[in-house]
């Protein structure tokens, strides 16, 4: 009996502590509201960065600086989808490659506007402790060349959102916080 108790008690303690740790990683409704707000803010920031990078009036040094800022919003291996009314296939590029291609488009004037930005799926906890959600945006693209040719489309895009608990040290104290990063941006629909 003593041998059984010797094993059962530590197992019970481990399960109790793991439940406590798990509870620490749950997101309260108030915290979720703040995280949702931060995620939407990061998507709006990306929208501004894309407009600046695509704008032909932006000098290359500024475009490069903004590309760096935009890249910081994403998880490491994220990809962004590119579609066209002229083809059915959607091409996917790593974030930096997408931003560089955007900056080098063969139009004399480029206007990109994101609108109707909203969550389509609530944050769901994953087995690794991260939370994942999806935000949808609509992107209006217009490219105009000097000879008067214009290309316009509207693309519906789904952006994967990752939320994870991180730690940082401030004045010798370890501080935990929830961070939001953007994942893949998938094209779901392209119309004229």
Regions found by a protein language model. Name each.
Residues 24-44, 84, 113-127, 173, ...:
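N-terminal targeting segments with Sec-dependent signals, encompassing both cleavable signal peptides
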Residues 52-55, 59-68, 84, 112-117, ...:
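Short glycine-rich, low-complexity/disordered patches
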Residues 141-192:
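Glycine-rich, aromatic-bearing surface loops/beta-hairpins
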